[in-house]
């Protein structure tokens, strides 16, 4: 038995001429091949799944590696029209008897980003992730603190606005402030987060309606936050999504949610 997470990159892709023969659709065969090659190069994916044989420090033994997953599907929209598209998505199945405080979001996002950058110029605008929070156990504080220290090494004058949304069930109704406070605590003094007072700039998210977990038009049960982070990058978006997921857990959320982080206009 497995539980599943999913990550999707949103943005604009300008294909290189020499990669024009590659295609990608809902089944995503080309993207899957690119992503799997990259994952294998990093040592992050194995057809053997979540465990691998460790040879060091004495006799060989089977150990768990939270950077691996058991199986995956992938696809994307490479339409060449200059519009924001869901460029790449990948699902990852994880055995139910293996639970960690974090999901392999950074691993999956990195290989997706590398894959699409291999075939063209990419303007990355947003990220969404399906987070099965009910499956996570343990404390991610140390990891999130280390990520915060990494992003602290940036020019504070170049901070950027980011829109964050959470699609959750009735249990999170009215908990905007509690979640906001938990997000701010985890971001520290290098980033900002506030409950959105009005309409949120979601121009960095593709116009999809439920595909791969995200529905841009969904209104009911959506928490909205206006954030500022030290930089805009794939890694920074993953950090925001992970921080938000951990804040939701702290606020009592124990269900599957969809979290987005997307670049907002400076004037919004």
What does each of the following model-derived ranges do?
Residues 82-94, 157-171, 213-231:
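Short glycine-rich, basic-tinged beta-strand/loop micro-motifs
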Residues 1-42, 135-176, 264-267:
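Short, extreme N-terminal segment that most often corresponds to the first beta-strand
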Residues 1-111:
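N-terminal leader/presequence regions that precede the main folded/catalytic core
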Residues 170-246:
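Intrinsically disordered, low-complexity segments enriched in Gly and acidic/Ser/Thr residues
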Residues 59-60, 67-79, 141-153, 197-216, ...:
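Short amphipathic beta-strand and strand-loop transition segments with alternating hydrophobic
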Residues 45-57, 117-133, 192-220, 250-268:
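Short glycine-rich, low-complexity/disordered patches
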Residues 110-150, 224-226, 232-268:
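Acidic, proline/glycine-rich low-complexity IDRs
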């Amino acid at each position: 038995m497995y539980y599943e997470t999913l990550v999707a990159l949103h943005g604009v892709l300008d294909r290189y001429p020499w990669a024009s023969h590659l295609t990608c659709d809902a089944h995503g065969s080309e993207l899957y091949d690119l992503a799997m090659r990259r994952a294998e190069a990093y040592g992050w994916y194995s057809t053997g799944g979540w465990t691998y044989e460790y040879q060091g420090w004495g006799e060989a033994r089977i150990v768990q590696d939270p950077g691996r997953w058991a199986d995956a599907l992938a696809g994307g929209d490479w339409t060449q029209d200059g519009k924001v598209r869901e460029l790449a998505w990948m699902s990852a199945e994880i055995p139910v008897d293996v639970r960690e405080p974090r999901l392999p979001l950074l691993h999956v996002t990195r290989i997706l980003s590398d894959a699409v950058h291999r075939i063209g110029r990419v303007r990355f605008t947003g990220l969404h992730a399906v987070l099965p929070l009910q499956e996570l156990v343990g404390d991610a504080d140390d990891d999130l603190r280390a990520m915060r220290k990494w992003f602290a090494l940036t020019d504070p004058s170049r901070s950027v606005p980011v829109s964050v949304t959470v699609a959750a069930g009735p249990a999170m109704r009215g908990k905007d402030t509690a979640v906001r406070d938990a997000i701010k605590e985890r971001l520290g003094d290098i980033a900002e987060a506030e409950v959105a007072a009005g309409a949120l700039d979601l121009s960095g998210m593709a116009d999809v309606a439920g595909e791969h977990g995200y529905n841009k038009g969904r209104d009911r049960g959506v928490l909205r936050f206006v954030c500022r982070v030290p930089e805009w990058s794939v890694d920074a978006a993953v950090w925001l999504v992970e921080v938000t997921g951990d804040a939701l857990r702290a606020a009592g959320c124990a269900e599957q949610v969809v979290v987005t982080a997307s670049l907002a206009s400076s004037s919004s």
